Amino acid sequence: MSSWLIYALLSAVCAALVAIFGKIGLQNLDANTATAIRAVIMALFLVGVVVAQGKLALVGEVVANKKAMLFIVLSGVAGALSWLFYFVALKNGNVAQVAPIDKLSVVFAVVLAVILLGEKISLMAGAGVALISVGALLVALG
């Protein structure tokens, strides 16, 4: 099995746990405050990973790359907005409805990759994107 597939599957399992743990943790709490606390925990955890890997010295290299930093900042803002919207949706909706709609990000990512990055997708991949769209809506609305 390819390493990218293993990491993608691990990511999917962890994302599922985010939905379950988030829904349980949000009971009677403000979603935005909980999201901010989650972000701090994630930041501390990730800094710990970088330190444990001995890569703290690479931070300066990343920060010095202006173009990379612009897109890392934009990615961070988009990610923060995604988390805020996701936790508000989880607080107010059912995991079985919110999680599939959230996964429409796959569809949006593919469409944006084609439009903005010039990536090419096969007819089979296009059919898969359509099936993901329909499947997410069927699960969420069914």
Regions found by a protein language model. Give the residues of each.
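Membrane-interface interhelical linkers
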Residues: 1-13, 29, 43-72, 83-92, ...
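Juxtamembrane helix-loop-helix junctions in multi-pass membrane proteins
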Residues: 17-42, 97
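Hydrophobic transmembrane alpha-helices of multi-pass small-molecule transport proteins
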Residues: 46, 124-141
